[in-house]
Amino acid sequence: MGKDYYKILGIPSGANEDEIKKAYRKMALKYHPDKNKEPNAEEKFKEIAEAYDVLSDPKKRSLYDQYGEEGLKTGGGSSGGSGGSFHYTFHGDPHATFASFFGGSNPFDIFFASSRSTRPFSGFDPDDMDVDEDEDPFGAFGRFGFNGLSRGPRRAPEPLYPRRKVQDPPVVHELRVSLEEIYHGSTKRMKITRRRLNPDGRTVRTEDKILHIVIKRGWKEGTKITFPKEGDATPDNIPADIVFVLKDKPHAHFRRDGTNVLYSALISLKEALCGCTVNIPTIDGRVIPLPCNDVIKPGTVKRLRGEGLPFPKVPTQRGDLIVEFKVRFPDRLTPQTRQILKQHLPCS
């Protein structure tokens, strides 16, 4: 069953134009979200605006009276009657309808947003509100006129304070970066999707935004990059900060230890005992020959100074490239080789 617009406004189906306006004025003031804090007030307020939009327009009202809501929105009867070329959908902003009805202003702004504007409310007369005595839309604020003078001794005025907005907690994302990006510095582009307030300050839209994250040379894992108030916005909150936390990507050759870079070099037992030269790759793509003339034991460490990552505060200085040696032992030895080793290797 479709909506009963007459019932929504509380008027009979034969109501005239003045009665429709009077009913809209009464119901819109009663259910305006600035006054009515019931959970369904916003939806009811929108229904009232839709009902007024239809019944205040002779063409829409005629189609509605003939075919009901469904007929109105589908273009009339299924046989293609006089309304067959007309299709109705309510796309309006109920708050805009409300403000337009009262001469382009929201009468509740005197209570809820007086700090935003001091201009008079053109076309709005509080005495023109035809509402029941017990349904006074401004009853919660005392019987005060718009010039600040009391209209009667009904209630004492109550102080009003704007509701204090609280910022949402930060939205944290992990941002993985390679050691090369840390070495050279880089800029990453991250797309976020968030809700933002429309100019009316009430409704929201969904939009995408590209955040440019500048990663400076030598930044440590765990460094936080914050974009203030780039989170979701609603009429009742302060948007959250968007925070990116750096996390090192696993690397094929290196591990990170602060500004030092660790590299594991695997050599044979022969190379460990007899000496060798090992080619060591660097974080910037070069190769450094490292002579090893002494016996290399498993776990031996050699340090190439200044070949690590930049210091965050002094990027011209760098940490070290630390080479950790691993020795690959043979799986088996021939009897002849075993005998030769016994003859030549020291006992201790």
Swiss-Prot record:
It holds the Pfam family DnaJ. Induction: Expressed under normal conditions, its expression can further be increased after various stress treatments. One of its GO terms (cellular component) is nucleus. GO terms for biological process: negative regulation of transcription by RNA polymerase II; protein folding; response to unfolded protein. InterPro entries: DnaJ_C, DnaJ_domain, DnaJ_domain_CS, DnaJ_subfamily_B, HSP40/DnaJ_pept-bd, J_dom_sf. PANTHER family: DNAJ HOMOLOG SUBFAMILY B MEMBER 5, DNAJ HOMOLOG SUBFAMILY C MEMBER. This is DnaJ homolog subfamily B member 5. It comes from Mus musculus (Mouse). The lineage of its organism: Eukaryota, Metazoa, Chordata, Craniata, Vertebrata. The gene is Dnajb5.
